[in-house]
């Protein structure tokens, strides 16, 4: 039976009231001036932490956690946890905060649904991906200590935090993965060690018996393939350095070639064929990455191969992303970066206003591709809108056709 609200003190009632009104400064004052336990519950069995998660207020949640709130506590009448409420709120950063404080990912409510399943039910796909891609820090700490006959750990201890963040990335577009590797302190300089740790993680995920996680195993494999491609690119650049003089460093567009290995690879990933606009190098790389997954009997491998081998298959990057993060419905209003496919890209090309990017860096990297079409896109916005409408209609027809042909 749920507790009665009549049993709450005036201070406890005030805390609930301030949380529900998102009054952050008042909550901060109440918590700092009154050293109380914050795991009390209201008439529905909800704690202050659960209320703050329901509101999606990360700042208040952080205050409550700092005050000692139990991330898994609660007496909710339908067994919803704080992570359930955070997932329903749509705040992926809040979900990550709770999980980093020990929130149970597999906790189920009264209808047997986990936080990730509830997030998927209401269409909060970012929360689903964040929860499914979360990895406990303890899984990484194993590799920062020498094991068995090893004379040194596989992963230098000072790289543990940046590596942990790198492997939990949700956006697995190869351009974004390469950029994240470059931006993570120390990882690019230790790319060979990073690749070996990823391969070890892949093997461990596939040898856990009943707890085998094919999705995470493939994700580790895929990340290791991107790292390996950067290593190969670096070796090619090193071999070329002694063979070419400064004049040979001028490319076909009359610009000086960049010595940045990651940028060279990104430009290869982005370069599209003139005939059909498909990024051929990226497509070939991703298909080869799938083929190289060593666990051929796994369900995830068979599904991806079957999809890519079908007639008129989707892009390889969409297949890889769906395998790791799950399928998701259409979202016509989603603003996706044209360079790395990061969502909520708010920066538009200042000339044509037809494409969007995460930031100036993504726009710069994509400019060599976009500049050929920029003027045309800017001159005929009505035609572009018409084309998009036709594309949406075509996609809708194809999807409906596929659904009708599914076996009963």
For the regions a language model picked out, list residue spans one by one.
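Ankyrin repeat boundary/linker residues
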Residues: 8, 42, 75-76, 109
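Ankyrin-repeat junction/capping positions
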Residues: 39, 72-74, 106
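Start-of-repeat signature of ankyrin repeats
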Residues: 11, 45, 78-79, 112
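Ankyrin repeat domain, specifically the short helix-to-loop turn at the C-terminus of the second helix
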Residues: 29-36, 62-70, 96-104, 132-138
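Conserved ankyrin/ankyrin-like repeat signature
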Residues: 26, 59-60, 93-94, 126-130
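Ankyrin-repeat-protein effector appendages
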Residues: 2-14, 120-342, 347, 367-408
């Amino acid at each position: 039976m749920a507790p009665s609200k009549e049993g709450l003190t005036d201070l406890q009632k005030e805390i609930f009231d301030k949380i529900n009104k998102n009054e952050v400064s008042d909550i901060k004052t109440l918590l700092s001036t009154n050293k109380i336990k914050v795991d009390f519950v209201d008439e529905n069995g909800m704690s202050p932490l659960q209320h703050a998660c329901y509101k999606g207020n990360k700042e208040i949640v952080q205050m409550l956690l700092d005050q000692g709130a139990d991330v898994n506590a609660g007496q909710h009448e339908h067994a919803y946890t704080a992570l359930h409420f955070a997932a329903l709120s749509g705040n992926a950063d809040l979900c990550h905060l709770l999980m980093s404080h020990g929130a149970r990912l597999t906790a189920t409510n009264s209808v047997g649904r986990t936080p990730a399943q509830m997030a998927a039910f209401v269409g909060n796909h970012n929360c689903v991906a964040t929860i499914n891609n979360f990895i406990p820090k303890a899984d990484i700490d194993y590799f920062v200590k020498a094991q068995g006959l090893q004379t040194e750990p596989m992963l230098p201890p000072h790289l543990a935090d940046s590596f942990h963040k790198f492997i939990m990335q949700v956006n697995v577009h190869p351009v974004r993965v390469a950029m994240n590797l470059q931006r993570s302190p120390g990882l690019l300089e230790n790319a060979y060690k990073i690749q070996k740790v990823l391969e070890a993680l892949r093997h461990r995920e596939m040898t856990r018996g009943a707890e085998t996680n094919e999705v995470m195993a493939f994700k580790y494999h895929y990340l290791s393939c991107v790292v390996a491609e950067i290593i190969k690119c670096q070796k090619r650049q090193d071999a070329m350095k002694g063979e070419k003089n400064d004049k040979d460093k001028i490319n076909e567009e009359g610009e000086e070639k960049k010595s940045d290995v990651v940028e060279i690879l990104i430009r290869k990933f982005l370069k599209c064929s003139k005939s059909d606009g498909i990024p051929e190098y990226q497509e070939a790389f991703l298909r080869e990455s799938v083929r190289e997954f060593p666990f051929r009997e796994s369900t995830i491998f068979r599904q991806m191969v079957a999809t890519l081998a079908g007639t008129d298959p989707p892009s390889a990057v969409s297949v890889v992303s769906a395998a790791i993060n799950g399928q998701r419905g259409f979202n016509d209003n989603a603003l996706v970066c044209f360079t790395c496919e990061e969502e909520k890209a708010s920066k538009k090309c200042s000339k044509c206003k037809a494409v969007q990017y995460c930031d100036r860096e993504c726009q710069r990297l994509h400019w060599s591709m976009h500049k050929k079409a920029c003027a045309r896109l800017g001159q005929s916005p009505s035609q572009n809108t018409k084309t998009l409408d036709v594309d949406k209609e075509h996609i809708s027809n194809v999807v409906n056709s596929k659904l009708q042909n599914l076996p009963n």
